[in-house]
Amino acid sequence: MERLSGLDASFLYIESPTQPLHVCSILELDTSTVPGGYTFDRLRDELALRIAAIPEFRAKLADSQLNLDYPVWVEDDAFDLDRHLLRIGLPSPGGRRELAEICGHIASTPLDRSRPLWEMWVIEGVADTDPRAGGLLAVMTKVHHAAVDGVTGANLLSQLCTAEPDVPPPEPVEGPGKAGPLQIAASGLVRFASRPWQLANVMPTTVATIVKTVRRARTGLTMAAPFGGP
């Protein structure tokens, strides 16, 4: 298992039905450049190979009522790609307006917390074209902010999409592993009990910083005002 950080867990705590906290990206693909042509099944098979190297896409949340710390990530033993890779068609004429409406609806729907916190939507019918005949295709990826930030999201995107068409898929990467409720609670208790010592360790540095700041303020050597630095 892998324990969430306080920042990552906060994205779970402040999320609400009207304020989903996931990150979305949209790619527009020209399928005429795909060697051998595009089919949805082929895209699915290629994605499955890459997900084996992306443990974030195979991990789900786990917690215990006795847990005094943040939730954890565990491997989803029942992971099913078909629950995350979804397919939809744009209504005619398949323009930017129709695409924006579909993407807005997808983005407004919260992710299912009982599964790995991501979805990928394959949107066909862009500009009234058929992707199987070399038309355009949009792919919208939605990942919870508790699982990725800006840098992590960019790294995941680079694993899903390569600059060269014939690059082999990356080697599989092990996930966070398993954990039962008792293990989650026990490790959470240990972390909770260690917090006073962690606080004691940072207190000297914090006090020294406060004293230094007060001395600088008394001598007029304060920090420059916003937008007022050299």
What are these regions (language model features)?
Residues 11-17:
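Short beta-strand/turn micro-motifs at beta-sheet edges
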Residues 1-8, 24-39, 44-230:
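Soluble acyl-CoA-dependent acyltransferase catalytic core bearing the H(X)4D motif
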Residues 18-23:
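His-Asp-centered acyl/peptidyl-transfer active-site segments
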